[in-house]
């Protein structure tokens, strides 16, 4: 366990962008809250006031999550390749650390540690934003931003998304690690060209698109399985702001669908595929180290 923790710390030492990028985003959003324009005079109807808190907090959270998704994917694509590129793999191989532990530490960093860092950064910056906006707008916005139940739901949503996306997108994660362990150069080309070639070959020789359909299902199938849809009107709240109709969940508890997600065969089929690719990355790392 101590070795694994040390490996995680090593990833943070060598990849300072893990914490620098979310810190920069947090500072930028805090500055925007401090100096941005707030309309103190417009009278907002009660139904729209109920929308302000969830909409603002979700927008802040989505900003961090979008950047986190891009950076985490980039990290997983580069982590094993970079060790070989700068030949630091030879140094780490000289230590009593297994290749399995090294790959799993990088997997943990990309799937769990980085999302948690962004979660903490989003939490702190959102608290600062709410405090600044409340002070600037006095009681006008304070009552809609400082709701303990809303903050609890935001935290639960973040942790739920971290856990479920880590499971659902494990095939993509495994592919990123596999390519990172295999490619000697042009990692992005190795990442993209084999799936495209397989898709084209299936279309050419068999006239089918099963592979492409499975990729699309994996890329787009997360939300329908992890969350309930809008079939239950009582679970959603809508309000018209200007010419736009904004709809948000009346409560996070109404839209989370952990039972449906965990009982889906597609979820666990993806886990098996992802685990196989991660195992392949470990074997490639071992062979690379031996050669």
Can you name each region flagged by the protein language model?
Residues 17-42, 60-73, 193-206:
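Hydrophobic alpha-helical transmembrane segments of multi-pass membrane transport/permease proteins
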Residues 41-85, 239-265, 269:
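Membrane-embedded or membrane-proximal helical elements that form or frame transporter/channel pores
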Residues 6-13, 82, 90-94, 181:
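Short amphipathic alpha-helical coupling elements at transmembrane boundaries
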Residues 30, 34, 48-74, 104-181, ...:
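Secretory targeting signals
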Residues 183-231:
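Transmembrane helix segments
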Residues 79-109:
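Helix-loop-helix units of permease transmembrane domains in multi-pass membrane transporters
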Residues 8, 178-188, 242, 250-291:
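Junction motif at the cytosolic side of a transmembrane helix
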Residues 1-23:
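Aromatic- and glycine-rich beta-strand/loop motifs that create alpha-glucan
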